[in-house]
Amino acid sequence: MDLKNLTQEERSELSLIDVAHFILEQRKETILFPELVKEIQAFLGLKDAEIRERLVQFYTDMNIDGNFISLGNNTWGLRAWYPMDAIDEEVQTQTTPKKKRKSDDDEDEDEEILDDDVDYDDEEIVEELGEEEISLADVLLDEDEDDDDHLPDGIEGDLATVEDDYTDGDYTEDPEDK
C-alpha cells in the first residue's frame, strides 16, 4: 500500500506503528528513534503536544510489535531485514581487543602464586600480630559479669522473683500432680 497518495484525513486515521513501518520500508536503513518520531510527525501533520501525548504508547507498541527490532543506541530497524542468525551478531557491540604490553621479564607470568597454593600458619600470624590467645572459658566468664543482669527500679523492680524449687537436680514428681 502506498501511503504517499493518501489524503490528510486518511493519514490521520493511521496508527503510528503503521507509519513507522512505512517509513522504515521506504528508507531501507536503520533510523534513530527521535528521527523516526520527527518523520512520523511530519507525515501525519501532528503538533508537538499531540505527538508527546502518544509517544509513550508508540514506544511501547514498537517494543511489543514483532516487526521492529532495537539494535541498541536507540536505533531501530525492521526485523525482516535480519535473518535470525545475524540478529545476535548485529546487536552485540564491536569491541577491539586490547593490545598486550611487552614485558621485560616473561618469567613473572609463569610464577603467578595463587592464594590456594600458600599454606598459612595461624600460630605464626598470631605471634607476629602480638595477639594473646583467648580461651572460650574466659569469654564465657566475661559475659556472665555483665551489668545487664540487674533490673532497674520501676515496674521490673516491683515484680516478685519466683525461685525454682528444683534447681539442685533432685527433682521428684509431686504425688499431688498426678
Swiss-Prot record:
The keyword tRNA processing does not apply. GO terms for molecular function: DNA-directed RNA polymerase activity. GO terms for cellular component: DNA-directed RNA polymerase complex. One of its GO terms (biological process) is DNA-templated transcription. Residues 14-81 form the HTH HARE-type domain. Residues 105-122, 141-150, 161-178 have a biased composition (Acidic residues). NCBIfam families: RNAP_delt_lowGC. Belongs to the RpoE family. Participates in both the initiation and recycling phases of transcription. In the presence of the delta subunit, RNAP displays an increased specificity of transcription, a decreased affinity for nucleic acids, and an increased efficiency of RNA synthesis because of enhanced recycling. RNAP is composed of a core of 2 alpha, a beta and a beta' subunits. The core is associated with a delta subunit and one of several sigma factors. This is Probable DNA-directed RNA polymerase subunit delta. It comes from Listeria monocytogenes serovar 1/2a (strain ATCC BAA-679 / EGD-e). The gene is rpoE.
